[in-house]
């Protein structure tokens, strides 16, 4: 289905990151793999940025041009971040802005 960039026209890829549950140290390898599939022109990280646990993402978002999306924890046991990512993914696909996704 997907081919390497050298064998095809450029695909637009969106990288959506669940920053509440993912270690930022893996971002380099993820972007390397996605770059072989297309151009990662949408980069978003979702989470509750008021939490100390997400402070480690600060330098990473700046270095890699990742746009932080604030998602408050309104209820316990529900994952609002997952829902926000899902809604944005469907919206991006519907608008025709992307050809594929990288989900972290």
PLM-predicted stretches and their roles:
Residues 2-99:
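Domain-level signal for Mg2+-assisted phosphodiester chemistry and nucleotide/NA-binding surfaces
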Residues 104:
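Active-site histidine-anchored catalytic micro-motif
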């Amino acid at each position: 289905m997907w081919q390497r960039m050298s064998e095809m026209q450029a695909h637009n890829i969106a990288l959506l990151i669940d920053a509440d549950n993912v270690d930022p140290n893996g971002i380099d390898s993820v972007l390397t793999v996605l770059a072989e599939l297309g151009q990662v022109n949408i980069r978003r990280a979702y989470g509750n940025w008021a939490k100390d646990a997400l402070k480690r993402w600060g330098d990473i978002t700046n270095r890699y041009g990742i746009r932080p999306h604030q998602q408050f924890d309104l209820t316990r046991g529900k994952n609002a971040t997952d829902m926000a990512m899902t809604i944005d993914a469907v919206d991006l696909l519907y608008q025709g802005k992307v050809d594929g996704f990288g989900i972290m």
